[in-house]
Amino acid sequence: MANASEPGGGGSGGGAEAAALGLRLATLSLLLCVSLAGNVLFALLIVRERSLHRAPYYLLLDLCLADGLRALACLPAVMLAARRAAAAAGTPPGALGCKLLAFLAALFCFHAAFLLLGVGVTRYLAIAHHRFYAERLAGWPCAAMLVCAAWALALAAAFPPVLDGGGADDEDAPCALEQRPDGAPGALGFLLLLAAVVGATHLVYLRLLFFIHDRRKMRPARLVPAVSHDWTFHGPGATGQAAANWTAGFGRGPTPPALVGIRPAGPGRGARRLLVLEEFKTEKRLCKMFYAITLLFLLLWGPYVVASYLRVLVRPGAVPQAYLTASVWLTFAQAGINPVVCFLFNRELRDCFRAQFPCCQSPQATQATLPCDLKGIGL
């Protein structure tokens, strides 16, 4: 009776393992397809749409391409390693392959962290110092410099082999980030660097939030009469609108007394130096989108960074296998979540997507946009 029951138990166990392997491979394939489709679609949208040829979208283009390359390089290797581990005579992945994949994972992780820090700084300058941002940082040279700096810093942070490939016992992440036993101080230093970069990014956005909140405080109006000898108004009671119009290049007549020695802006590139309300709303929407990407990066990479800290400071077996598996899968999901966040938080991207792909727009939405188009041409 005992001999008769053993094959049945082995068959049921083998079926459960096969089902778990199939579910794991299907999930990895879905993540790979979603990441490649979303990131490539947004990259093509940014390249084809001329209204998106601005510095923030160039940085978003680099982030999308990096996420797509990470999914294309790492997820198929994890799928292959999972199949090898589940095979009866499966061989563990080679040490060189694991080191290469661990280097790529660290490279893309540090690249995203450094790039998001640069994006946070540019977002702060775009709102707090808009004139300096519009004159110096709004073009593609600044975006190219930030992209090159992010890749160079990421390469410098990921190249030393203190972050090695994991062992063959981790079926879900056989080639994920793991410190070497003899490289614990170096691994701790790089983990501290990653935490410092992510923390600095959130501090920049916190400073931006305080800046916006301070500018929204209501102050009581002081009704002091303004001084006027011609069309210009100056003095304590003046609102400054005439001087602002004259400085921006829209005023006519003599120079206001308070602006003697200042030349008005001409019709060239420096004519639009004031942050009007619509531009301010656009910059705020971009800030919300990039901060959502930064926050998701922290939430999805945070559990694995905590596990890495425990492995470095305590011992490799101090982290439960279930927690390690869940944290690794969260890092896999980060490669395909950014296009979804961009589509949800950026109305300009949604409008450009509907314009480039009219087949994705419903007839009701097309009819709803018709009066707006007629209103835009003056009918």
UniProtKB/Swiss-Prot annotation:
Subcellular location: Cell membrane
One CC-aspect GO term: plasma membrane
This protein's UniProt keywords: Cell membrane, Disulfide bond, G-protein coupled receptor, Glycoprotein, Membrane, Receptor, Transducer, Transmembrane, Transmembrane helix
Entry's transmembrane regions: 27-47, 59-79, 101-121, 143-163, 186-206, 290-310, 325-345
UniProt topological domain (Cytoplasmic) ranges: 48-58, 122-142, 207-289, 346-379
Membrane topology: Multi-pass membrane protein
CDD domains: 7tmA_SREB1_GPR27
GO biological process, one term: positive regulation of insulin secretion involved in cellular response to glucose stimulus
Membrane topology (Extracellular): 1-26, 80-100, 164-185, 311-324
Gene3D superfamilies documented for this protein: Rhodopsin 7-helix transmembrane proteins (1.20.1070.10)
Chief location category: membrane
Disulfide-linked positions: C98-C175
Any one GO molecular function term: G protein-coupled receptor activity
Pfam hit, one: 7tm_1
Residues bearing carbohydrate: N3
Cited function: Orphan receptor. Possible candidate for amine-like G-protein coupled receptor.
Family: Belongs to the G-protein coupled receptor 1 family.
PANTHER family given in the database record: G PROTEIN-COUPLED RECEPTOR, G-PROTEIN COUPLED RECEPTOR 27-RELATED
Protein name: Probable G-protein coupled receptor 27
Gene this protein is translated from: Gpr27
